[in-house]
């Protein structure tokens, strides 16, 4: 059977989180009543002239710098001409041959792999969003309504080279891209609200060939999982067509998430179908290098840079660093807690396991989490200083969730400080040995897990307050080192 290679390129549209639209002063707030955020410019009324939003331009430059793009110092806007009910002017203001950013790329790592992968970018350009069609849910009333609140919202379109060879690569590419955009705070990347949208261009070719096959563009991809599923389905469909000797036209398809298949929408238009030409209402943009460098100075530490620092400077495992740096707010929370606790690994464990566990379960952001980074740092410091055990820390944490008290106050009020009285601990250890002779026998026969039962007895009697390190030390002195297994 013939073997094929998959070729994938992605086009990502990210709404820029500006207060107003790209060419007018209308607001961009999501969820407002239909057609309540419009003005003559975004309605396409005669005589209404566009004026570029400087903040949108700056955010586009920042995105380009974050992905290592070259910034075009001489750029312009073009009219992309087509008819659709949600496009009141009959054209979209976009960029054709002089995009604001060219080149660059996205670095990502597939889960379970050590080496990073890199996908080149073709360009990033600025454009305005279209409105939104709302179709009647009643099949007996075949009507559609137009909401132009979204029309004119600033977008960047991030176009990749066809460098991806699997749906997994596409999935992790998108995750990395989203992480960077959120880190630099140019977009909230909320797919449910439509502020991040993706189209996938998919083709196949015989392995070893350098000629591209017929390309299919897939739209209506409302999640990264949908992107992965749509690519997998489309690749199998194209392979079947090739093996049966059938051909097909370049076309645009929709992803049907109910039927889990791609459905043909239309034959694909080419760029000449849009009759691009420079927008006569907008002057060309001549950027100064100083302007670009000013934007560069505002760039925060990016996810990969931060991840590497967590591994190299803080000594965290790679997995911990990946979890903590996936979102800027989580990484900030961790570092704020670490400033108080002074113990990177213990702080990492608490943030990624306990705190993110609650955040994910309750479907909230870490900024909405009820316990501040400072209070978590104080709790971890008590553990790191040996004042409380991990088990007691979880009891304290439960109270932190519902109380404004700090960890040390809770520990003091409940008398939870670890017992360091050697004589008292030795008394409990002797009692544990006397009452757990079966475990002692197993330990002396080489079964190291048996020691856990004795330690557990000590912790139970001391109500978790005995110093675990001291308990283990005393047990080893009294029982001797673990003998070799016979």
UniProtKB/Swiss-Prot annotation:
SUPFAM superfamilies for the chain: GatB/YqeY motif, Glutamine synthetase/guanido kinase
Reactions performed catalytically: L-glutamyl-tRNA(Gln) + L-glutamine + ATP + H2O = L-glutaminyl-tRNA(Gln) + L-glutamate + ADP + phosphate + H(+); L-aspartyl-tRNA(Asn) + L-glutamine + ATP + H2O = L-asparaginyl-tRNA(Asn) + L-glutamate + ADP + phosphate + 2 H(+)
Signal peptide from the UniProt entry: none
Main EC class the enzyme belongs to: ligase
Binding partners and assembly: Heterotrimer of A, B and C subunits.
PANTHER family given in the database record: GLUTAMYL-TRNA GLN AMIDOTRANSFERASE SUBUNIT B MITOCHONDRIAL AND PROKARYOTIC PET112-RELATED, GLUTAMYL-TRNA(GLN) AMIDOTRANSFERASE SUBUNIT B, MITOCHONDRIAL
Residue intervals passing through the bilayer: none
Stored InterPro entries: Asn/Gln-tRNA_amidoTrfase_suB/E, Asn/Gln-tRNA_Trfase_suB/E_cat, Asn/Gln_amidotransferase, Asn/Gln_tRNA_amidoTrase-B-like, GatB, GatB_C_1, GatB_Yqey_C_2, Gln-tRNA_amidoTrfase_suB_CS
UniProt-recorded name of the protein: Aspartyl/glutamyl-tRNA(Asn/Gln) amidotransferase subunit B
UniProt cross-references to SMART domains, sorted A to Z: GatB_Yqey
Function noted in UniProt: Allows the formation of correctly charged Asn-tRNA(Asn) or Gln-tRNA(Gln) through the transamidation of misacylated Asp-tRNA(Asn) or Glu-tRNA(Gln) in organisms which lack either or both of asparaginyl-tRNA or glutaminyl-tRNA synthetases. The reaction takes place in the presence of glutamine and ATP through an activated phospho-Asp-tRNA(Asn) or phospho-Glu-tRNA(Gln).
Lineage per the UniProt record: Bacteria, Pseudomonadati, Spirochaetota, Spirochaetia, Leptospirales
Enzyme Commission designation: 6.3.5.-
Keyword list, A-Z: ATP-binding, Ligase, Nucleotide-binding, Protein biosynthesis
Any GO MF annotation of the entry: ATP binding
């Amino acid at each position: 059977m013939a073997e094929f290679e998959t070729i994938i390129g992605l086009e990502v549209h990210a709404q820029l989180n500006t207060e107003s639209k790209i060419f007018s002063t209308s607001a961009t707030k999501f969820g407002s009543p239909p057609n309540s955020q419009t003005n003559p410019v975004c309605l396409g009324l005669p005589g209404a002239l566009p004026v570029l939003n400087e903040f949108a331009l700056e955010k586009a430059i920042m995105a380009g710098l974050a992905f290592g793009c070259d910034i075009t110092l001489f750029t312009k806007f073009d009219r992309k001409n087509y008819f659709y009910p949600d496009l009141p002017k009959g054209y979209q203001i976009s960029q054709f041959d002089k995009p604001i950013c060219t080149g660059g790329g996205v670095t990502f790592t597939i889960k379970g792999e050590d080496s990073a992968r890199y996908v080149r970018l073709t360009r990033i350009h600025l454009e305005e969003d279209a409105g939104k069609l709302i179709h009647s849910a009643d099949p007996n009333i075949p009507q559609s309504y137009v909401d132009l609140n979204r029309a004119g919202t600033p977008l960047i379109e991030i176009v990749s080279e066809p460098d991806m060879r699997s749906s997994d690569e596409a999935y992790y590419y998108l995750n990395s891209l989203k992480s960077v955009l959120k880190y630099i705070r140019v977009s909230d990347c909320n797919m449910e609200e439509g502020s991040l949208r993706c189209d996938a261009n998919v083709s196949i070719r015989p392995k070893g060939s350098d000629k591209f096959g017929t390309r299919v563009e897939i739209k209506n991809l409302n999640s990264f999982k949908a992107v992965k599923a749509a690519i997998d389905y489309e690749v199998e469909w194209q392979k079947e067509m090739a093996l049966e000797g059938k051909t097909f036209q370049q076309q645009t398809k929709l992803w049907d998430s109910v039927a889990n298949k791609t459905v043909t929408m239309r034959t694909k238009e080419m760029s000449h179908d849009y009759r691009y030409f420079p927008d006569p209402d907008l002057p060309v943009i001549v950027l100064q290098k100083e302007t670009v460098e000013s934007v560069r100075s505002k760039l925060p530490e990016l996810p990969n840079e931060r991840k590497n620092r967590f591994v190299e400077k803080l000594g965290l495992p790679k997995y911990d660093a990946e979890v903590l740096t996936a979102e800027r707010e989580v990484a900030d929370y961790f570092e704020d807690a670490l400033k108080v606790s002074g113990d990177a690994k213990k702080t990492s464990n608490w943030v990624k396991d306990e705190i993110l566990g609650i955040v994910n379960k309750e479907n909230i952001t870490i900024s909405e989490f009820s316990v501040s980074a400072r209070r978590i740092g104080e709790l971890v410091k008590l553990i790191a200083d040996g004042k409380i055990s991990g088990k007691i820390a979880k009891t304290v944490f439960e109270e932190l969730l519902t109380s404004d008290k700090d960890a040390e106050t809770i520990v003091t009020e409940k008398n939870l400080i670890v017992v360091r009285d050697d004589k008292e601990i030795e008394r409990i250890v002797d009692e544990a040995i006397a009452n757990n002779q079966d475990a002692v026998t197993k330990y002396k026969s080489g079964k190291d897990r048996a020691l856990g039962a004795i330690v557990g007895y000590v912790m139970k009697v001391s109500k978790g307050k005995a110093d675990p390190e001291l308990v283990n030390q005393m047990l080893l002195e009294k029982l001797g080192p673990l003998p070799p297994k016979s």
